Amino acid sequence: MTPSQAKLLIVNADDFGITEGATDAIIECHRAGSVTSTTLMTNMPAAAYAAQRAREHPALGVGLHFNLTSGRPLGAAAGSSIVDSRGGLLNGRDLALRAITGRLRAGAVR
């Protein structure tokens, strides 16, 4: 690859799939040339919509948004130390509190 072919800056848009509106905004930024990649939140309500939009724009790089603090877990997590009493993922503060107080069980994330 010659220096003129190398990408000098990668602009990644976070939270692809969190909502249809956010997903569409990321696609529009990509089409305008300002976003080169994004990370998909696979457990969010608009994840399937985002996956479809990504297929329509194959030049958009899509990676995984590793998410432990928003929405509901994709796998079986009942009774897990990373979920709240309603079955949703803990927010960042509560997850950190469990970790530093020793209440985050090994194997909770797999």
Explain the meaning of each model-derived region:
Residues 2-20:
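Boundary/entry segment of secreted carbohydrate-active catalytic domains
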Residues 109-110:
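CE4/NodB-like, metal-dependent polysaccharide N-deacetylase domain
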Residues 61-68, 90-92:
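Non-cysteine beta-strand/loop elements that form the S-adenosyl-L-methionine
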Residues 14-16, 41-43, 65-71:
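Active-site beta-loop-alpha junctions enriched in small/polar residues
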Residues 73-105:
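Active-site gating loops and adjacent loop-to-helix segments of metal-dependent hydrolytic enzymes
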Residues 8-10, 35-39, 59-65:
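Structural preference for beta-strand elements that scaffold enzyme active sites
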Residues 20-45:
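A short alpha/beta connector and helix-capping loop motif
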Residues 26-32, 50-61, 81-88:
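Acidic (Asp/Glu)-rich catalytic clusters
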